A protein has these predicted regions:
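C-terminal scaffold of the Radical SAM
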Residues: 1-106
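Short secondary-structure transition/capping segments
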Residues: 7-11, 119, 141
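An alpha-helix initiation/capping motif
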Residues: 76, 111, 137-140
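Short, well-ordered alpha-helical segments
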Residues: 108-116
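A short, conserved structural fragment
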Residues: 118-131
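Minor-groove-contacting beta-hairpin "wing" of winged helix-turn-helix DNA-binding domains
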Residues: 132-136
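Short, amphipathic alpha-helical interaction segments positioned at domain boundaries
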Residues: 138-151
């Protein structure tokens, strides 16, 4: 039997848009800003530059180890939530989606996206209930194609 002890917990953090901090050269982090939008940043890749930045920071001079910083838009967060949620066997909890984003999923994606997704449902690649959207085992084999609808 497959148990929860076989679950990759750090991936679940990424796929749930939960905060995480990365330490060390090339490490990436994700935090939630005051406005609720996602903030991403990563450290320099050079070990020497990373260590030097910490030495300088401790001496109160010089730049930080952060090399790049980006702030998500609302649609970035929505798209990432859907894209990563569909990677999980449990799929997307539509109640959590509404709480997080203040609207139903299909208010963000109507028209051709919804129509194309319904074709995947009709073909047995995805399943939809009142509470959940998920990919079936058959759908996992073409998951990137399905997830691309929401990016």
């Amino acid at each position: 039997a497959f148990g929860t002890e076989n679950t990759c917990r750090h991936n679940l953090k990424y796929w749930g848009l939960e905060e995480y901090l990365g330490f060390g050269p090339s490490a990436h982090s994700y935090m939630t800003g005051a406005d609720g939008r996602g903030l991403r940043f990563n450290n320099v890749s050079s070990v020497e530059k990373y260590l030097k930045s910490w030495e300088d920071t401790l001496e109160d001079e010089g730049p930080s180890a952060v090399e790049a910083f980006s702030e998500n838009t609302l649609m970035d967060d929505v798209s990432e939530y859907i894209f990563t949620g569909l990677r999980k066997n449990s799929g997307i909890d539509l109640g959590d989606f509404r709480r997080r984003f203040g609207k139903d999923l299909w208010e963000f994606y109507s028209g051709h996206v919804r129509e194309e997704f319904e074709e995947y449902v009709d073909g047995g690649f995805a399943a939809v209930t009142d509470d959940n959207i998920r990919l079936t085992v058959k759908g996992m084999n073409i998951s990137n194609r399905i997830m691309a609808l929401f990016v």
